[in-house]
Amino acid sequence: DSCLVGSEMCIRDRVRTAFSPIVRECGDISAGVFDLEGRMMAQAVTGTPGHVNSMAESVKHFINHFPLNTMFEGDIFITNDPWMGTGHLNDFVLTTPCFKDNKIVGLFSCTSHLTDIGGLGVGPDATDIHMEGLYIPMLKLADKGVMNKTLLKLIGQNTRQPVETEGDVYSLAACNDIGCKRLVEMMN
């Protein structure tokens, strides 16, 4: 129950800090706590069921791309790769390892729809993935607590709403940070 409450509280923080109206007004988001094998331990009640399933797949792929023994406190991983667990390029997944006493104890992940990610926009006119918008493979958004400003600038400059897009990425990162803190508090 504590993990569920923690996930739900993070969702509320994400909705409160969201730049995208689709998050604030429609709840197009999900969040969850995962064990070290990428299995979901709890998910927020608020949110989109489709995001929950895709987010769960993304966490497993993040663990495969970035083995647990290479993760550090303050790391944040990001993708919008539909083949690695997002519905489409507008859905961003951020995953953060949670640490207690310098040991990784779980992962917190959240998914959210961003209003614009470049490209033609949402619709049937795209004939390949690149026409849909900026395609972000599994990357490290933060390394030991230091945000990758180059990646953030790249993301922002490839959208029609750079400020809102960057704000939503930071909001997702904060959601995970709060989730990890609440997980550790629960463990204490």
Q: Which residue stretches match the model-derived regions?
A:
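Single conserved hydrophobic/aromatic residue that forms the stacking wall/gate
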Residues: 1-6, 10-11
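N-terminal leader/propeptide and maturation segments of large enzyme subunits in energy/redox metabolism
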Residues: 135-188
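Gly/Pro-rich active-site capping loops and adjacent beta-alpha segments
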Residues: 104-158
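Phosphate-interacting basic helix/loop segments used at nucleotide- and nucleic-acid interfaces
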Residues: 12-18
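Gly/Pro-rich turn-and-neighbor structural signature
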Residues: 19, 27-79, 188
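A short, hydrophobic, proline-anchored segment that marks a local hinge/packing element in signaling
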Residues: 91-101, 109
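Short, small/polar residue-rich loop motifs at catalytic or cofactor-binding pockets
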Residues: 25-28, 90-92
